[in-house]
């Protein structure tokens, strides 16, 4: 449960980026993020993804989804 604040902030910012990019609601964007494998990478402290920028994580999300 380390780095929870960083993860919460990162998830919030990435969700906002998804909503803005795809012109969907925050709720829909959150669902998309939580249904993706990216959320597991953020949650895994060993990946260190929680310390990356929201734009970097968003780019990973886009790469995985090719929407």
Where are the model-predicted features located?
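C-terminal alpha-helical interaction appendages
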Residues: 1-67
């Amino acid at each position: 449960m380390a780095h929870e604040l960083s993860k919460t902030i990162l998830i919030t910012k990435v969700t906002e980026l998804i909503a803005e990019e795809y012109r969907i609601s925050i709720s829909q964007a959150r669902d998309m993020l939580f249904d993706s494998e990216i959320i597991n990478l953020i949650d895994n402290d060993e990946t260190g993804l929680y310390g990356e920028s929201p734009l970097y994580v968003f780019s990973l999300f886009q790469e995985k989804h090719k929407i």
